[in-house]
Amino acid sequence: MKIGVFLPISGRATGPETLTQAAQSAEQQGFDSIWSADRVVTPWQINTFYPYSENHEFIVPPDRPFLDSFTCLAFLAGCTEKIMLGISVLVLPYRHPLYWARVAVSIDRLSKGRLIMGVGVGWMEEEFAALGVPFKERGKMTDEQLEIVEKLWSEEHISYEGQFYSIQDVAFHPKPIQRIPIWIGGEGMAAMRRTAKYGDAWFPYYIDITAAQLRERFDTIRRMAAEAGRNPDQIQLACCRAIEVTRDAVPQEETRLRGTPEQLIEALNAYREAGVDHIALQFMVPRWPDRVEQIERFASEVMPHVR
């Protein structure tokens, strides 16, 4: 099982020194990937149901600095050598596919084939409104974008006619070094169907799920893929999970990753046994220095035992 760690691309301590240290340390410690999140703008008033916290309220203050995910990964491509560079996840309707496909290929080539494209439809209706993008059409827009990008990265004369995008006989060069993996974010049935049709991996971020439940839902995706004529073995199971390393043993819940190194080894091995190919971990510690300490403990005391 490969293991990734989220980067500090938001917060007042964020800057080139912190990012460089975080990425280079992760590479030296043996992590397989580093991850950035996506945000364009944060409205002051947010009423949309937030799916990634227990009280369903968005936990990031509107005035918290938030760096662009693509820019951070391009910067870190030159500061690292082998670690994979991932986005979790790019909200596709926020950008035209011709634009982000170009940026993605540029990062892939500058990093010598290390980019992972986590993609999703987005959730914050207020952010869609600020960008002038129709919230209710985000799923259809995402599907069209995935079809377009597949053409851009593989064909010479690219044309596409859809409900939202129209492209007539354009060239797109250079092509990516690798076949840039598309990891589909999202937890609902629509995201599962999208993974079965377009994805190289399913990449959900659940706050409350067991490894066995995750596997059960992935098996549903595999069945959908087979019904669509795809080889299910071409789709990987990946996931994002929040994690906390504690000093003392705590009561264990199958739906949480929280505990001592020994407890986390047992919990993460359940994910490995469930067939998870890659897990991206978000260490839930507010202050970056404290997070550094947790990441170091995890890398030395947990990671060697859960590969």
Could you tell me what each predicted segment is?
Residues 1-307:
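Active-site-adjacent structural elements that line small-molecule/cofactor binding pockets in enzymes
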